Amino acid sequence: MSIDSLDMEARGVGRLLNEDGTPGKVIFVEGALPGETVSYRSFRRKPSYEQAHLVEVRQESVMRVKPGCQHFGVCGGCSMQHLDSRAQLAIKQRVLEDNLWHLSKVKPDVVFRPIAGPDWGYRYRARLTVRHVAKKGGVLVGFHERKSSYVADMTRCEILPPHVSAMLVPLRELVGGLSIRDRMPQIELAVGQEVTALVLRILEPLTDADKDLLRAFADQHKVQFWLQPKGPDTVYPFYPADAELAYTLPEFGIRMPFKPTDFTQVNHQINRVLIGRALRLLDAQPQDRLLDLFCGIGNFTLPLATQGKSVMGIEGSEALTTRALANAEYNGLAARTEFACRNLFEVTAEDIAALGRFDRWLVDPPREGALAVCKALGELAQQGSNVLPQRIVYVSCSPATLARDAGLLVHGAGYRLAGAGVVNMFPHTSHVESIAVFERG
């Protein structure tokens, strides 16, 4: 069978022909690439499609490359290592444009050059699963196997920073020596500028011997351990207690302290480039009042504060709102910033109107998108309100919800999609991050 394209999960897509020559059932083949002729084995059959494993590549695509990780194909952390990095970007751009058009009949005036950076060692945040497996004689620490609840037997990971990848085997040995080796379901990783933090989710208290092992490991590998006995709000630094987790935005002279459970961007290098492009697209003037929705700890808010007259950040999490305020004070930007905690998934037109007019907005929602915000703007446009901003820069981590929201802004609130492009925040995965700019009038 010939493979024509890739789907959102990086599976090759081919189509069988019926006996009369008309297009038949769609076949999704894991590991196959566009332009290839393959043989496959189906493992799930439905009336209109089948899912299949790749058996043999009979004609190879020019886009196929050797995966950079020995665990690729088993580990579920990556799905595109067999695809040339330039082709990955092109496919992600096509996914973005297809979603915009097919879901909302919207096309960008300009397609931006993709934002891309290092393909390896980029992942500064990760959630690793811990599993005590008696049959394997120890503990596994890593990502899940592809489409499985099993943990991959990983000895290194090429998308993690090299010092973290080199720590995986010692970390397995450490956990295997703890009394609660079977009562620690996950380890959350957060890498800062100077500190690497490991958050241990513990279901039972550590013994004194366990604590000694953690201290010795932290000293040897230059990491900081945090403990999480219950929910995310119970996280606290264990050892060393005084290390500060932070990342920097040197272009703006900003340092951003954060807790390892706070939301921060996975890819530090791409984050810096993304902020720079977002600010250039927003093109704030010295007299402008700016609004940053879903502001988190102030990742965009504080750089924006160096551009316009003032900026207001709104965030749904009280903890993140508090952190954003503290970061503004830490960086000497408190006088030019204001923060509020609001549920932006339930915001109304009246709520938006009550904020007053802001000249330009930056919107950076989670995967759910900004549905309520965009609906509210549509209602305000119908009312002839003067609070709608001239320009909106929208940073998205889901092309489907961006497309939905773009349709509301373009068809309901009088904006045009001036430009859009992909941001390769997660190389070698099918995750599509993007940035778009909307203009009104």
UniProtKB/Swiss-Prot annotation:
Which keywords does UniProt give here?
4Fe-4S, Iron, Iron-sulfur, Metal-binding, Methyltransferase, rRNA processing, S-adenosyl-L-methionine, Transferase
> In the Enzyme Commission scheme, what number(s) does this protein have?
2.1.1.190
Domain (TRAM) spans 1-56
Q: Does the keyword Transferase apply?
A: yes
Q: Which residues bind S-adenosyl-L-methionine?
A: 265, 294, 299, 315, 343, 364
Amino-acid positions noted as binding [4Fe-4S] cluster in the UniProt annotation, renumbered to this chain: 69, 75, 78, 157
Catalytic reaction equation(s): uridine(1939) in 23S rRNA + S-adenosyl-L-methionine = 5-methyluridine(1939) in 23S rRNA + S-adenosyl-L-homocysteine + H(+)
Q: Which GO terms describe its molecular function?
A: 4 iron, 4 sulfur cluster binding; iron ion binding; RNA binding; rRNA (uridine-C5-)-methyltransferase activity
Q: NCBIfam families from the xrefs?
A: PRK13168.1
Function according to Swiss-Prot or TrEMBL: Catalyzes the formation of 5-methyl-uridine at position 1939 (m5U1939) in 23S rRNA.
Q: Which PANTHER family match?
A: 23S RRNA (URACIL(1939)-C(5))-METHYLTRANSFERASE RLMD, RNA M5U METHYLTRANSFERASE
Q: What is this protein called?
A: 23S rRNA (uracil(1939)-C(5))-methyltransferase RlmD
